[in-house]
């Protein structure tokens, strides 16, 4: 590329930066004026409102005046918010106005037009022509999808065809061109090398400048209700999904808001890691939660829900034996649709018998016993649904409570509590008596009426929580109804081996008030079938990350909970860590969906790690040969044979070397939290190190110790596998955990063993890693 072209491009950058500066100055001035107007409006709100309550017409006039003033204030606040958003985008553009250029000549046109692509659009000073096109604009799709030559894009007026004569990429920092490349179809390796060769961060970065064609298919898909993305570790699937969110918010900005979209992330740490991507693109963050928090909120306080990571920890630390086999058999069966069918049969059985009800009590007095409720319930016609019959029971119970309340308020304790009411309650009673014209100084029964009202107030307040519980059908003892499943004899059902042991274990946990993680969704499914629960219609798009860890039953539950939703489903079967996901269907299984509504895309190219780390890691998992490492070279992974007592000094030496190389994030990765705590105890007095736990919501640069199941989706400059021995990694179910740990490293990977190395390394060619012994 000739020097004069670079000079011309830099001159254009300078001109664009000047326009941005002028716009920032102009909007900042307007923003100050609008802000002052908002402050004045708030201060003088009631002075500008005409208040007159003498006549009905005056009341309406007052309401209209208040509404008008409130709408004026709301409009000013909205304008102020829009200006803030504009300023944020302009400030980002000022540093790096754009990252791409295409020259496109439409059919029947003589000249090509130069289109510059950035994270936001920018008009010229006269607001007539685009200086920068937003990367989400229809015309910008050609930058990601085509090489120079015939190309097209879909506009609102139909398909536009033409010829792309140039495709150019830029690296611009602080308004200066640092790199400039003319490229073919894919975003050029020179740009990717520059981006991927950088340091890891405690927050995920936007990939908008380096989106690949296959990622662009994910981002711009608008036709399929369920979009499944199976992507190798480091393939950019989560990044692409977040760019997809930004694209959809832009594309449907008149009908879709960020609070209409929800992201299920694997843990709070990952939520923090990705939290800066959407704001970087000028969009508000979507609603974020974890599946565990979502389920826990719906279960409520009646049961103590097991954390899924505690379930994983238990399975990984349990010795091989009958107890482990029973737990895993139970986890896998309860995740299946066969178990849901068993629950459906149980629900059908409950129409005839088996419902268990709680006593309705007040102040240790049984108003209606559970047995009496059961008799009433089963006396109703059984041709009705469970919910219809329960609603009739509810209405009957509310009548019984009302009758009880009327009797109970005559008791002495009610008057004693009435004497503790505050002055406002007495004033309210006086006002009510006056309104009924039942209060005057000349009558002798005023105090009786006052006492009756006081008693009524006290009783209504005390009985209100009970009435609310009855209205919510909480008189059903759902825990016991669910536990009864595990007391039944099953002859026609397909139950797993060890069913008797599974039943005993489940009964014991529920009797103690615990809900094992594998029972959470089945329990909620049964409970909500009995009590009825409306779906969430506000959320219109779900993004589910690490979908390989979701079972078919969990998918079915989410579909019912969010009936209007489209879903973007991301995962990698090679990174499955939960027992339910291994050797079973998961949310990534295409056949679980209506074939007319689903599309599955596969990302095979891995960008995170060096070629050496990926060549090593992909050999660990079946089918790993399909994964394509990005051509970025680095050191070979290193396996070190050491003693337990020698581990600390090796780790400290490696950390020093990482720092010397300029690395900023490095992790010691353990298989379990138990292992991580042991490592932390070993190192905490010798290095500045932080232990990451389930309660950790963010991490900073530096040295951390983290279990594999919390490191999912996160990347580090360098990673050390704390124990890669055969004693620690030998079960076939641990292969994907081992692979997940190895693929966290961007630039360097070290594996420590005291004793024989993991048999998983037998599948890796010795040319793909160094083997050293401590002291060599």
Regions found by a protein language model. Give the residues of each.
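Alpha-helical nucleic-acid-binding subdomain
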Residues: 249-542, 549-557, 565
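A positively charged, amphipathic N-terminal helix/segment that binds anionic biomolecules
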Residues: 171-172, 242, 358
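Extended, charged low-complexity regulatory segments
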Residues: 1-208, 212, 216-217, 758, ...
């Amino acid at each position: 590329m000739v020097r004069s072209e670079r000079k011309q491009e830099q001159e254009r950058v300078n001109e664009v930066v000047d326009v941005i500066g002028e716009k920032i100055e102009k909007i900042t001035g307007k923003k100050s004026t609008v802000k002052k107007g908002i402050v004045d409006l708030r201060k003088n709100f009631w002075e500008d409102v005409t208040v007159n309550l003498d006549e009905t017409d005056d009341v309406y006039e007052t309401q209209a005046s208040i509404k008008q003033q409130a709408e004026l204030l709301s409009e000013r606040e909205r304008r102020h918010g829009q200006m803030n958003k504009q300023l944020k985008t302009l400030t980002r553009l000022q540093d790096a106005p754009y990252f791409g250029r295409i020259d496109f000549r439409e059919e029947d046109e003589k000249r090509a037009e130069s289109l510059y692509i950035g994270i936001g659009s920018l008009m010229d000073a006269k607001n007539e022509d685009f200086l920068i096109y937003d990367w989400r604009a229809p015309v910008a799709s050609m930058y990601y999808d085509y090489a120079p030559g015939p190309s097209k894009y879909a506009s609102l007026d139909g398909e536009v065809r033409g010829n792309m004569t140039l495709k150019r990429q830029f690296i611009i920092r602080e308004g200066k061109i640092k790199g400039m490349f003319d490229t073919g179809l894919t975003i050029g390796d020179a740009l990717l090398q520059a981006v991927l060769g950088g340091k890891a961060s405690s927050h995920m970065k936007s990939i908008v400048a380096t989106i690949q064609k296959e990622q662009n298919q994910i981002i711009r898909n608008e036709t399929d209700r369920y979009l499944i993305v199976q992507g190798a570790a480091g393939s950019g699937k989560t990044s692409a999904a977040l760019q997809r969110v930004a694209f959809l918010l832009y594309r449907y900005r008149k009908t879709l808001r960020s609070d209409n979209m929800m992201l299920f992330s694997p843990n709070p740490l990952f939520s923090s890691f990705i939290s800066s991507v959407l704001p970087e693109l000028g969009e508000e963050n979507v609603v974020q939660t974890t599946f565990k928090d979502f389920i826990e909120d719906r279960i409520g306080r009646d049961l103590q829900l097991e954390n899924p990571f505690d379930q994983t920890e238990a399975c990984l630390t349990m010795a091989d034996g009958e107890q482990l086999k029973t737990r895993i058999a139970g986890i896998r069966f309860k995740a299946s649709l066969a178990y849901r069918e068993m629950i459906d049969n149980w629900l059908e059985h409950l129409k005839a018998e088996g419902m268990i009800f709680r006593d309705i009590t007040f102040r240790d007095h049984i108003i209606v016993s559970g047995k009496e409720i059961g008799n009433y319930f089963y006396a109703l016609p059984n041709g009705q649904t469970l919910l219809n019959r329960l609603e009739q029971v509810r209405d009957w119970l509310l009548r019984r409570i009302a009758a009880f309340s009327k009797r109970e308020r005559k008791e002495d304790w009610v008057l004693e509590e009435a004497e503790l009411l505050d002055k406002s309650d007495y004033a309210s009673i006086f006002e009510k008596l006056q309104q009924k014209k039942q209060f005057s100084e000349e009558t002798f029964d005023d105090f009786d009426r006052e006492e009756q009202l006081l008693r009524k107030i006290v009783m209504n307040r005390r009985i209100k929580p009970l009435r609310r519980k009855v209205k919510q059908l909480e008189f059903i003892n759902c825990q016991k109804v669910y536990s009864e499943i595990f007391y039944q004899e099953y002859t026609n059902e397909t139950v797993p081996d060890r069913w008797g042991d599974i039943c005993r274990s489940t009964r014991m946990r529920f009797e103690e008030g615990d809900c094992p993680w594998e029972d959470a969704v089945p329990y909620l499914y049964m409970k909500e079938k009995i009590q009825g629960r409306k779906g969430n219609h506000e959320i219109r798009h779900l993004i589910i990350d690490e979908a390989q860890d979701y079972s078919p039953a969990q998918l079915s539950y989410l579909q019912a909970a969010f009936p209007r939703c489209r879903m973007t489903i991301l995962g990698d079967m090679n990174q499955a860590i939960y027992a339910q996901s291994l050797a079973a269907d998961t949310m990534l299984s295409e056949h679980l969906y209506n074939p007319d509504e689903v599309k599955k895309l596969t990302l095979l190219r891995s960008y995170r790690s060096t070629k050496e780390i990926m060549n090593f890691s992909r050999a660990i998992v079946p089918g790993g040969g399909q994964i394509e490492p990005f051509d970025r070279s680095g050191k070979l992974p290193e396996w070190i044979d050491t003693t337990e007592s020698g581990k600390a000094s090796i780790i400290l030496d490696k950390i020093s070397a990482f720092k010397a190389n300029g690395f900023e994030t490095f992790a010691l990765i353990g298989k379990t939290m138990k292992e991580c705590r042991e490592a932390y105890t070993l190192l905490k007095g010798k290095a500045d190190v932080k232990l990451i736990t389930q309660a950790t919501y963010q991490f900073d640069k530096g040295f951390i110790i983290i279990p594999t199941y919390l490191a999912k989706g996160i990347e580090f400059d360098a990673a050390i596998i704390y124990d890669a021995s055969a004693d620690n990694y030998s079960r076939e179910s641990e292969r994907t955990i081992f692979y997940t740990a190895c693929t966290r490293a961007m630039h360097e990977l070290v594996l420590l063993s005291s004793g024989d190395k993991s048999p998983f390394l037998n599948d890796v060619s010795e040319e793909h890693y160094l083997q050293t012994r401590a002291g060599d």
